[in-house]
């Protein structure tokens, strides 16, 4: 699609939780059923690093930047409305480096989570950020697909009123 080509920029770095150099585990064999190609060190993966090495994964060093630092360096002309995150177990690594961006722009997020611990951490984080969390799909490989949207002030006020009404009913029976 030539129209999309004008709006896409390919950059030679990985998004992470720090501006640094990190180990990236990569495989050229994406058809073996173990991965879609690679993951950054610290990702929550279904198998041990030793297993990945035994099937041909190699360690390479990659430049990493936070999404916050990337967004600060870009000249944003359109506010991001939707962000999709599918990063093979590095969801919370990415999110840790994107908090300023998320707080400033309040985008809708579609995230594929790769473990129960990532689901819990993501739920805790976005509950504090006043996001509504909806599970779209879950499969038998510990992957959960979620949709997160910011709760508006109007929705917050309605939730508070509903909770106050609930507490009154409980108190007075």
Regions found by a protein language model. Give the residues of each.
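Phosphate/nucleotide-binding beta-alpha loop and adjacent structural elements of enzyme active sites
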Residues: 1-173
């Amino acid at each position: 699609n030539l129209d999309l080509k004008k709006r896409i920029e390919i950059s030679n770095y990985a998004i992470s939780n720090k501006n640094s150099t990190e180990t990236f585990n990569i495989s050229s064999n994406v058809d073996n059923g173990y991965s879609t190609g690679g993951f950054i060190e610290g990702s929550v993966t279904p198998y041990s690093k030793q297993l990945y090495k035994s099937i041909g994964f190699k360690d390479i060093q990659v430049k990493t930047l936070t999404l916050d630092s990337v967004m600060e360096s870009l000249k944003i002309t359109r506010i991001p409305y939707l962000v999709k995150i599918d990063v093979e177990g590095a969801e919370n690594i990415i999110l840790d480096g994107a908090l300023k961006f998320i707080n400033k722009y309040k985008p809708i997020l579609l995230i594929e989570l790769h473990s129960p611990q990532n689901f819990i951490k993501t739920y805790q984080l976005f509950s504090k950020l006043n996001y509504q969390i909806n599970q779209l799909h879950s499969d038998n490989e510990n992957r959960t697909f979620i949709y997160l949207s910011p709760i508006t002030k109007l929705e917050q006020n309605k939730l508070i009123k509903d909770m106050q009404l609930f507490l009154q009913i409980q108190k007075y029976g």
